[in-house]
């Protein structure tokens, strides 16, 4: 069992609850629950990525669709002059995000062939990295190609035992609700606009019931034919914050989440805030294991940060604040 790193800024003391073993979920290139080091002659490149999910059909590459993963791999193949092209690259992500879902701290890794020469007219500064990859230049080149909907916040060469998915100790999502009478065009696509007044105190009370080891079948999309799939998860923290100007932010942390789990929980909690459900109905709904029908839209959901054991953590702090998730002055 991995120990948790320090929780993101603003997280409560419940972040220090240890995470027990739970099924790991997310999109990867293999279904085997183990870490594979890079093949000989390749290095493991790690990236911390932010993106606007409403511009893509999720992160997993899909033929004929514009996805975060597909666009990122194409850019990497060009920047690194990958001999085998984009087909020689496979992306492993810390957390799968569906269509419309954003990310601020998505961590990915990809095994690449170090370029024999340099980028552009100048050679790589091989003194920086023995592997011959100038990560600062890779970051600049990628951002020049991927803006404005994708931003690469950091690039480094990861140790071979690092895996963006399986090495993670926790994942933290943030959901933004705009609770105002009129919409805000500057938060469109980044929040769920709810016009009815919400009782934040009862929403906080209800959210506490999600903490712990539970079967979240009532709050998850049923797994599609995945052998050994389970809806049991361990939630270590939940938190609602009123940031002002009607912007409410819900954060939830766990080792792993099942599909649509966060959106289902937020939809349920907003119903509690509207007075349609009681704060005490969470455990009753869990026990029934019947999927409830209040699913929050994807617009407000963001993969906020991912934690790793200290020896495997990316050098870039993953907790931070994107301008799009703060109330405007």
State where each predicted segment sits.
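Structured-RNA-binding interfaces characteristic of tRNA pseudouridine synthases
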Residues: 3-4, 14, 19-329
């Amino acid at each position: 069992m991995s120990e948790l790193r320090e929780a993101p800024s603003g997280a409560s003391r419940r972040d220090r609850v240890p995470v027990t073993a739970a099924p790991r979920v997310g999109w990867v290139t293999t279904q085997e629950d183990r870490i594979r080091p890079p093949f000989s002659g390749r290095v493991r490149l790690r990236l911390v990525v932010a993106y606007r999910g409403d511009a893509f059909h999720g992160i997993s590459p899909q033929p004929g669709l514009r996805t975060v993963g597909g666009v990122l791999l194409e850019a990497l193949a060009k920047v690194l002059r990958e001999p085998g092209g984009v087909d020689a690259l496979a992306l492993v992500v810390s957390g799968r995000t569906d269509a419309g879902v954003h990310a601020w701290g998505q961590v990915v890794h990809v095994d690449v062939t170090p370029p024999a020469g340099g980028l552009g007219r100048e050679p790589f500064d091989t003194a920086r990295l023995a592997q011959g990859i100038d990560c600062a230049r890779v970051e600049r080149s990628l951002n020049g190609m991927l803006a404005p909907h994708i931003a690469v916040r950091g690039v480094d060469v990861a140790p071979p035992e690092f895996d963006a998915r399986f090495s993670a100790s926790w994942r933290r999502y943030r959901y933004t609700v705009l609770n105002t009478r009129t919409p805000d065009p500057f938060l469109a696509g980044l929040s769920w606009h709810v016009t009815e007044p919400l009782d934040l105190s009862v929403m906080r009370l209800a959210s506490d019931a999600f903490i712990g080891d539970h079967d979240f079948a009532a709050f998850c999309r049923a797994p599609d034919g995945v052998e050994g799939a389970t809806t049991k998860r361990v939630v270590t923290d939940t938190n609602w914050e009123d940031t002002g100007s009607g912007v409410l932010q819900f954060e939830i942390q766990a080792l792993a989440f099942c599909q649509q789990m966060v959106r289902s929980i937020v939809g349920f909690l907003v119903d509690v805030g509207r007075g349609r459900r009681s704060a005490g109905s969470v455990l009753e709904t869990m026990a029934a294991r019947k999927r409830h029908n209040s699913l929050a839209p994807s617009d407000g959901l963001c993969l906020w940060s991912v934690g790793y054991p200290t020896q495997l953590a990316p050098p870039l702090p993953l907790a931070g604040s994107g301008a799009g998730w703060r109330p405007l002055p």
